[in-house]
């Protein structure tokens, strides 16, 4: 009887772990589906050209977050002629393939004036896939100040996406500063747009 109970308990734990993983992948797939369906630039049949890496939990990190106090505003380079005012709000730290990675978190001065976006933060980054498998001017991951809990930020690169400049001209998209150009490969999130002219 004890042996049967142990077997049933093991099966239950295994099925629970499987369902949790399945639930994670399902939620990410829902995120990607919604991203494609509601895309602000790519329309109609062109949406078939949006590509993504297979969902991989390896690229989901509980990062240590360090707030940078009294960080000065600076003009961040963009893909166009207009520079945009940002500041380093903080830094995140995580380890990938035995490499400690540091990325700066930025806050837009313009978006702080918009009530719905005043807590918006983002991480623009380039990595070892940039220009090969992913857009040559980098990708973004964004979130809210409220997502930072006890100096921990969940960064899921499966949600990394391309700026609008990857699809069409006419936008001034922030270009990742040199501090956010890393040598490891983030093989997660959105890939290079097939119809990109850049």
Q: What is the predicted role of each segment?
A:
Residues 1-23:
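Bacterial Sec-dependent N-terminal signal peptides
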Residues 20-73, 83:
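Start-of-domain marker
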Residues 21-29, 161-198:
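Extended, aromatic/histidine-rich regions of cofactor-dependent oxidoreductases associated
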Residues 46, 57-59, 71-78, 90-92, ...:
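Terminal leader/tail segments of proteins
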Residues 62-64, 95-97, 104-106, 126, ...:
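A structural detector for beta-sheet-dominated domains
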Residues 67, 109, 129, 161-163, ...:
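Short loop/turn segments at secondary-structure transitions that flank enzyme active sites
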Residues 78-137:
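Mid-length scaffold segments of soluble, non-membrane domains
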Residues 122-162:
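Acidic, glycine-rich flexible loop segments
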